[in-house]
Amino acid sequence: GPLPDVLGVNRGRVAGRHVLVVGSGHSAANTLLSLVELARTAPGTRVTWAVRGASVTRAYGGGDADGLPARGMLGARLRSAVEAGEVELLTGATITRIARHDDGLTVTLTGERELHVHAIAGATGFRPDLDLLRELRLELDPALEAPRLLAPLIDPEHHSCGTVPAHGADTLAHPAEPGFFVVGAKSYGRAPTFLLATGYE
């Protein structure tokens, strides 16, 4: 679903409370920065960021040298918030249990570390809604849910937004369905590497 609107419609659920954000992509970064902004005007708001990996270097982007200036600025702002103590960062964190109680949630992480929070914002990935296409014979990569020929070109394990090579219509094709193509962000399936600029090349 959409990112939580912590500065708008969801403000009442998180203002003055402890919020755990899980994930290390752009959705997590934007949610964290919105919560930091909220915390500046809503005393008692506490922000914790949990990531599975040992490092968040990739989430910080390339700063001023980033090929995508907006991504570099997003990462620089996030790094600054963590370094200033506005966001508590937990690396190597995997949630093993969540228990609801009267005043919030108890989240157990690997190593039996417990956090007491009021809300969790899960920003751990997304997938395209392919229900409309269920009756078609699509050739999709099982991990990315993107066209089979496109998947290796956009795999986030090997590419970021700036390293995806230009590709043509052939990579979007589904041989069993001649003339059928999924285009735009949905064509990238679960990969967060979609850029309009790549489509114009």
Please provide the spans of the model-predicted regions.
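A conserved FAD-binding loop/helix module that cradles the flavin
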Residues: 39, 167-201
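Cofactor-binding loop segments of dinucleotide-utilizing enzymes, especially the Rossmann-like FAD-
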Residues: 24, 52, 185
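Short, surface-exposed loop/helix-turn segments at secondary-structure junctions
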Residues: 133-161
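Glycine-rich dinucleotide-binding loop and its adjacent helix/turn
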Residues: 1-39, 47, 144-154, 165-169
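Mid-domain beta-loop-alpha active-site segment that forms a flexible
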Residues: 24-34, 73, 77, 195, ...
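Short catalytic/ligand-binding loop motif for oxyanion handling, primarily in non-cytosolic enzymes
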Residues: 29-30, 58, 129-131, 189-191
